[in-house]
């Protein structure tokens, strides 16, 4: 009987393993509507071996490989070129780049009007050049995932968009942006570049009022624990719910959370910090749905949003309609928005939506101390460090900030030895009871439930973020 039971037991274990993997978050700390993206889980590992813009061993080569794939790095530094992601089921583990991290000096984008989905990207810096004929200013986003879905962006540093920093315009849905740093969108009026904005999501069919069942939905967006600096507005601009904006910091912007497209859905806006800066006067919220008729199908839950605007408003606002000091200081709604849309007694329960992982909500009073040491891609480069310093000092301005040397304070190091080229160092494999000469054991299911390669890259990301509390990637100053 044993020879009959053994294959049955193995088949059962495989089914259980696949079931467990299907229920796992992108990584243990993943939250929000994009938390269940699996990326390249279960697929091949591709190693980036050079900093070329294309060709074998490049990042572009790695993400272009067929099937599910996890991309790791044995180099670190600057990649001069755009990155096109042709299809989903992809994990990019920027945290594996040894020493200096990875900066993409170009745009990261998926094909417009394609349903590219299931992508996990961590610890990458995206810093495109100035607009040109290929990327004119009205299309010049650092990250353009306009029609993508099921995306997790974690510890991303993005800057130098001339349209938005991150574009989710065309109905993109089921997306989390968390612990990321969006700074220095391009502002240069001498060239007509004055659209320095943050993140946008919309469902274009709402504009015609003729949405069909097969249209992209938009919404299902989580903006969690991020820092925005020097963006005029759209920090973020979300017109479609369900969506949530929780525990973010916005500095030196005009408008924080905004609608300015035809809107529909429910929104939780909780525990954010809006800090006035020197470039423009602050308006923490702007609800402008541009709907042609009422009632407008939107509703809002606002709680514990901290405003630092000396001379105008200093303190925590709940429902802005019920706060006389706030409503005296700011105009925040127009075009049919009514006070009764803000009358929720509790936050919207997004747990009814499949794949949603409720975020931990932290106090709005200590966001700077908690976020500034750990946000963005590790280690912080000179752009990130400057942005953080200007926020801390409450100075700086909108501009096209381009340091001559983006490698200041960043030191590439030698990658660990990986004999079997499965993305996991020999020493780590031995510690985990794996075989450093077996190139196929990266998909071994570990006690955590994750595959071995995921355990490795997840642990590395956690340790890098913790290290940032004590070291910001720069030499002592």
PLM regions: where:
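Right-handed parallel beta-helix
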Residues: 79-216
């Amino acid at each position: 009987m044993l020879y009959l039971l053994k294959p049955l037991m193995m088949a059962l274990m495989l089914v259980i393993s696949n079931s467990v993997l299907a229920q796992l978050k992108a990584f243990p700390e993943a939250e929000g509507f994009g938390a269940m993206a699996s990326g390249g889980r279960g697929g091949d590992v591709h190693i980036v071996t050079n900093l070329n813009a294309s060709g074998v061993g490049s990042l572009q080569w790695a993400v272009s490989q067929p099937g599910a794939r996890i991309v790791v790095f044995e180099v670190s530094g600057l990649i001069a070129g755009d990155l096109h992601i042709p299809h989903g089921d992809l994990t990019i583990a920027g945290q594996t780049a040894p020493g200096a991290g990875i900066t993409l000096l170009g745009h990261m984008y998926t094909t417009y009007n394609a349903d590219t989905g299931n992508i996990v990207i961590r610890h990458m810096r995206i810093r495109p050049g100035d607009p040109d004929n290929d990327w004119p200013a009205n299309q010049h986003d650092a990250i353009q995932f306009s029609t993508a879905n099921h995306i997790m962006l974690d510890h991303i540093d993005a800057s130098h968009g001339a349209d938005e920093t991150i574009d989710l315009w065309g109905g993109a849905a089921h997306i989390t942006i968390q612990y990321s740093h969006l700074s220095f969108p391009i502002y240069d009026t001498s060239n007509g570049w004055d659209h320095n904005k943050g993140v946008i999501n919309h469902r274009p069919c709402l504009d015609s009022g003729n949405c069909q069942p097969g249209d992209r939905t938009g919404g299902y967006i989580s903006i969690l624990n991020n820092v925005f600096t020097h963006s005029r507005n759209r920090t973020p601009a979300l017109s479609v719910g369900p969506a949530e904006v929780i525990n973010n910091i916005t500095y030196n912007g005009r408008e924080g959370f905004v609608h300015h497209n035809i809107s529909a859905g429910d929104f939780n806006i909780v525990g954010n910090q809006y800090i006035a800066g020197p470039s423009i006067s602050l308006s923490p919220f702007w609800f402008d749905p541009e709907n042609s008729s009422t009632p407008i199908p939107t509703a809002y839950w606002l709680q514990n949003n901290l405003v630092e605007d000396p001379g105008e408003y200093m303190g925590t606002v709940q429902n802005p309609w019920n706060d006389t000091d706030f409503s005296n200081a700011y105009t925040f709604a127009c075009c049919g928005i009514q006070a009764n849309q803000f009358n929720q007694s509790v936050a919207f329960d997004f747990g009814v939506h499949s794949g949603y992982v409720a975020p931990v909500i932290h106090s709005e009073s200590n966001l700077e101390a908690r976020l500034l040491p750990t946000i963005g891609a590790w280690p912080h480069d000179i752009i990130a460090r400057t942005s953080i310093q200007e926020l801390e000092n409450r100075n700086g301005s909108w501009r096209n900030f381009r340091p001559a040397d983006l490698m200041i304070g960043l030191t590439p190091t030698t990658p660990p030895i990986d004999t079997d080229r499965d993305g996991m160092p020999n020493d780590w494999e031995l510690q985990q009871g794996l075989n450093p000469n077996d190139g196929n054991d990266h998909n071994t299911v570990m006690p955590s439930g994750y595959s071995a390669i995921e355990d490795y890259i997840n642990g590395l990301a956690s340790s890098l973020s913790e290290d940032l509390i004590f070291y910001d990637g720069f030499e002592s100053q």
